[in-house]
Amino acid sequence: MSDSMKWKKLGQIITPNKINRNWMITHAMDPTVDHIEGDIFRVYFCGRNNNNQSLIGYADIDINDPQKIIKTPENPILGLGSLGSFDDNGVTASCIVTHKNQKLLYYIGWKPRSTTRFGLMTGLAISNDKGETFKRFSKAPILKLTDREPYSILTAPFVLKDNNDWKMWYVSCEGWEHSDLPKYNIKLATSSDGFEWKQDGIICLNFKNEKETAIARPCVLKEKGIYRMWLSYKNLDQNYRIGYAESEDGINWIRMDDIVGIDVSENWLGLRK
């Protein structure tokens, strides 16, 4: 079991007023980090345009001076899908993996609904130029609706190459309490190549009590044979918090939220719903 963690908040790094781009009029959300070289890291994230639609761009930073942005693209590296597709109203970065000289960007596609607030499905885009531009692997989501997973929230994946296997922990909707309140937990999918995925509907992290309504945005490391997951969770009484869990097999997890070492602030850091 890991010891208690302690995090120091350094404040805002990427904001719309620091980056003057038409794809980033408002918002800088859902950071997804890739190590470039040395102390340089690329933070993929989404801004929102004048139509309040999320588009994916990036900012390169030096980890020793993260307030200074080295580079951002003039245009988004991934825009909206074609009209009527699962990602025609927004795209959000979720995980980036380097594989055979390619960058695989697993992303969230946003789709407005009529009877429920939205659909969120998982897409894949590929870069052959070290992450400067991306092309969709498919116009369809790479996770599929099934009888065990019939709701259109299969999303926010984290992908880990684990020896010869690929593992994906992702958000899966268990149902809607009403049109604006989905309930979702974390499930596991597996793959031999990172492109085609097998969904068994295995619940890895479920709600810890009746009030908890969401477990989301998993991020997983494997150290000394132990899988370590940072996650987000919320319940009916509070907004999102960061949680933590550990597993020996990647399937059965023990929640250890009390040792995560970070909580909400009184300023902007505590406002995310």
Where are these regions (language model features)?
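Carbohydrate-active catalytic/glycan-binding domains of CAZyme proteins
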Residues: 1-273
